[in-house]
């Protein structure tokens, strides 16, 4: 049987499907998630149910968002899970997660995310950060390194700044390719994202911060002065105590927020 066929389902490349099969890894992830009935538990991309089964067993109801119609049908007919699942068939990138919030209950979101959509999905989920208690995701190891990077690290970029603006980022464990069927060509890792109840560096307009980061990191090898000359002058950099000769990856989250807030003040 092809390595792309697991439990009778052929992994679809266009959906970025790699199914988790390592029981030890599964148990460690479920232990990190801490399933409970005090939150709305939400799984993105349940696939063949490697995480779905142990999580659903521990709680009364699990909400899942799955794009693949064949996998949705399997879950709808699952002898054990079907009565515990609330299934949304559709694209998580377009999904309004705020509709899942119940009064007095925040979301706990988790999933073995398709690697081809993981970065845009992170940005989408940050929009709902205030409604989310925790997020646990299996990602390409390189993405986890980007999420958790410090200034000066080559992995530090736009995703880093936005993730660390909204969340505390905690790498949980690394997962080798042989833990999946079919094995991906890259190493994987699990990350915990804890949205801040109160952000350490509040921004006056997060859209300005997002645009500023996009502009700053568009040409990583150039200086801030070069990349941000349309929005900040040398005098304004001096006011902020930021050296405009530095490169974008050398600037902290706090400094990016300070720059964005200055841009907001100028636009007011």
From Swiss-Prot:
It comes from the Bacteria. PROSITE patterns: RRNA_A_DIMETH, SAM_RNA_A_N6_MT. Its main location: cytoplasm. GO terms for molecular function: 16S rRNA (adenine(1518)-N(6)/adenine(1519)-N(6))-dimethyltransferase activity; RNA binding. Keywords: Cytoplasm, Methyltransferase, RNA-binding, rRNA processing, S-adenosyl-L-methionine, Transferase. Transmembrane segments: none annotated. It is found in: Cytoplasm. Its EC number is 2.1.1.182. GO terms for cellular component: cytosol. Belongs to the class I-like SAM-binding methyltransferase superfamily. rRNA adenine N(6)-methyltransferase family. RsmA subfamily. Specifically dimethylates two adjacent adenosines (A1518 and A1519) in the loop of a conserved hairpin near the 3'-end of 16S rRNA in the 30S particle. May play a critical role in biogenesis of 30S subunits. It catalyses: adenosine(1518)/adenosine(1519) in 16S rRNA + 4 S-adenosyl-L-methionine = N(6)-dimethyladenosine(1518)/N(6)-dimethyladenosine(1519) in 16S rRNA + 4 S-adenosyl-L-homocysteine + 4 H(+). It comes from Shewanella sp. (strain ANA-3). PANTHER family: DIMETHYLADENOSINE TRANSFERASE, DIMETHYLADENOSINE TRANSFERASE-RELATED. It is an enzyme of class 2 (transferase). S-adenosyl-L-methionine binds at residues 18, 20, 45, 66, 91, 112. This is Ribosomal RNA small subunit methyltransferase A. SMART domains: rADc.
